[in-house]
């Protein structure tokens, strides 16, 4: 364990009401950057704000959600503060690097060891950033279990103003069009009926859908199924899909490759 404080960074406009929620979920401190320039996500002002926070407070580790925004913001910020970033991590651990001591090479302790799929999901890599700070990673939703909130918990609030100077990198948002799509959140399902290439065809998934309906469950799948276009990617379980924690998991026609098992082993 690092025996250190956890600090959340809250970026946005009129977001002060979220501080207590962050405290209840474990933040010891909350750095708040509240500015009209952050009303809608744009890469430049958000990257500037977060980079300035890092430059001032110099954290050892900076974690960002591997969401659509996080996958844009994380790499931009890491480049600005001259450090590395490991994207789409499926496991985070604290340990020694190199993992095994090498004669003549210093083994550094309390390093963030970041595990993620590599080479198209065909192998798993554990990556460290021993020489630069902060150690940065984006972490996929569902990888870490959501802690139970502690009602009434309070955090130290730090108001921070990075100073915004609009430049030619600031885009102007003309309009936002939201498309409402029918998606299924398999990460919250208690019962999953998951099919793989062995199911045989898109039509055969009707059998799995009937079983899932009878059990009040949800249909999921392996990567081979989404690659074949039988089901949409929001149903995919695995290192290149979603991490799930159902109470019951039916694996039908799935070979059990390590990349798939990594998404449901807990």
Q: Can you say where each PLM-predicted feature lies in the sequence?
A:
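N-terminal glycine-rich FAD/FM-binding segment characteristic of electron-transfer flavoproteins
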Residues: 1-266
